[in-house]
């Protein structure tokens, strides 16, 4: 589910922009456009969704809700089901898009913090190695100078 949720904001963003431009969009077409960009788990779930869509979009959305019981996916399915009933819910779609964008930003910030910590550890190790090298180098320089002047 974690890998699906990492890809879901991109998928929803694509759905949002398609539906905000035109009303007569088939969800299956949007999914087919997204599949080449999806990760393995997301493509698997969307593939099942496309198989279920043969029985109707409403059925496919209900099955998706059952397979991925995550708040954002459930909200997405509810929004799409209400669109099928003829309601214009761009404001709800926009709200969910903003929520998913915030989630994506939060995820990216966490990733950035992890990378910073890893970078700081690597820098510390490199500084220790360099300091050790400098100490050993100057130690041998001093020993060499002492031998030179003791003759």
Model-derived features with residue positions:
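Hydrophobic alpha-helical segments characteristic of transmembrane helices
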Residues: 10-31, 63, 70-110
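Juxtamembrane/interface alpha-helical elements of multi-pass membrane proteins
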Residues: 1-51
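Alpha-helical transmembrane segments
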Residues: 1, 82, 132-136
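Hydrophobic alpha-helical transmembrane segments in multi-pass membrane proteins
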Residues: 41, 74-75, 125, 129
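Membrane-anchoring/interfacial helices and their immediately flanking loops
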Residues: 46-66
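Bilayer-spanning, highly hydrophobic alpha-helical transmembrane segments
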Residues: 103, 107-151
């Amino acid at each position: 589910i974690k890998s699906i949720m990492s890809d879901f904001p991109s998928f929803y963003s694509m759905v949002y922009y398609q539906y905000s431009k035109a009303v007569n969009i088939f969800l299956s077409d949007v999914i087919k456009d997204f599949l080449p960009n999806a990760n393995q788990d997301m493509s698997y779930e969307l593939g099942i969704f496309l198989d279920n869509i043969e029985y109707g979009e409403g059925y496919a959305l209900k099955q998706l809700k059952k397979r991925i019981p995550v708040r954002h996916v459930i909200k997405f399915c509810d929004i799409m089901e209400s669109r099928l009933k003829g309601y214009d819910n761009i404001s709800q779609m926009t709200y969910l898009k903003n929520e998913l964008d915030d989630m994506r930003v939060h995820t990216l910030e966490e990733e950035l913090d992890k990378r910073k910590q890893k970078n700081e550890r690597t820098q510390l190790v490199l500084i220790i190695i360099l300091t050790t090298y400098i100490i050993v180098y100057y130690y041998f320089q001093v020993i060499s100078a002492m031998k030179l002047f003791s003759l």
